[in-house]
């Protein structure tokens, strides 16, 4: 039954809201009664109207999600000490195995940074590696060093620009964003490279970053393809853009 088919009373019998009883005259003005009941018994009313049917309202029931959320909150915050494991015990690896390897002092705790996990030698010599714990920013961690754990150089910081690092890209032109199409094309061209600041000379690779295959090289499209691309990038001029199109 739809909302406006009030004959069978989807929200209750249509006569109970208007106060009319069925009586013996079975079909009196059915449409007016249904219309009055439809608007008076509207369930989504603002506030409490005197026409709401209180005996038809469903009572609230406990959702199974409420119990699970309550149990989860009690497990995390209830017993008082469980949620403090990750937050307060980062200086020692006794509770949950997590350890703040970047901010610890030289207490000789375990392997120095990536030395133990990366297979660097002497990871268990705690007192010997204690001084190297704070020097993790450089490549000198632990006994074996972070370079021994796979040969990957440690990037100094996430905020260090590429032009300040040297060794990851051929950054003779500064940031790799500045490598326009042919400005540094000869740098990585034939695979000889420049070898800036003592890095190996084969960084240029097969074409390199600065060559014509740079990731942001200026591509020039000519001919019919250019006209087709330019026409497809812009909307037709006779097309009116209404704001509801963006919402839809």
From Swiss-Prot:
Record-level GO cellular component terms: nucleus
Keywords (A to Z) from UniProt: Activator, Developmental protein, DNA-binding, Homeobox, Nucleus, Repressor, Transcription, Transcription regulation
Function: Sequence-specific transcription factor which is part of a developmental regulatory system that provides cells with specific positional identities on the anterior-posterior axis. Binds the consensus region 5'-TTAAT[GT][GA]-3'.
Motif, Antp-type hexapeptide: chain positions: 241-246
Name this protein carries in UniProt: Homeotic protein ultrabithorax
Family: Belongs to the Antp homeobox family.
GO molecular function annotation: DNA binding
Ranges annotated as biased composition (Gly residues): 116-125, 140-152, 182-191
Region annotation Disordered: where it falls in the sequence: 116-191
Principal localisation: nucleus
Keyword Lipid metabolism (UniProt): no
Metal-binding in keyword set: no
């Amino acid at each position: 039954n739809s909302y406006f088919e009030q004959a069978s009373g989807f929200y209750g019998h249509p006569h109970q809201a208007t106060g009319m009883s069925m009586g013996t005259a079975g079909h009196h003005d059915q449409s007016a009664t249904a219309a009055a009941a439809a608007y008076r018994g509207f369930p989504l009313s603002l506030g409490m109207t005197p026409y709401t049917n209180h005996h038809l309202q469903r009572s609230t029931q406990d959702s199974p999600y409420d119990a699970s959320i309550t149990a989860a909150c009690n497990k995390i915050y209830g017993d008082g000490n469980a949620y403090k494991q990750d937050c307060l015990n980062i200086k020692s690896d006794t509770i949950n195995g997590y350890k703040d390897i970047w901010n610890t002092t030289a207490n000789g705790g375990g392997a120095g940074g990536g030395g133990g996990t990366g297979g660097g030698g002497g990871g268990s010599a705690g007192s010997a590696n204690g001084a190297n714990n704070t020097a993790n920013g450089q490549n000198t961690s632990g006994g074996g060093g972070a370079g021994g754990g796979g040969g990957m150089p440690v990037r100094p910081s996430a905020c260090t620009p590429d032009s300040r690092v040297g060794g990851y890209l051929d950054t003779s032109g500064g940031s790799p964003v500045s490598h326009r199409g042919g400005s540094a094309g000869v740098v990585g061209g034939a695979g000889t490279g420049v070898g800036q600041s003592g890095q190996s000379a084969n960084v240029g690779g097969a074409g390199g970053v600065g060559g014509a295959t740079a990731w942001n090289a200026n591509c020039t499209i000519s001919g019919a393809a250019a006209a087709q691309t330019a026409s497809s990038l812009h909307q037709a001029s006779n097309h009116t853009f209404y704001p509801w199109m963006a919402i839809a």
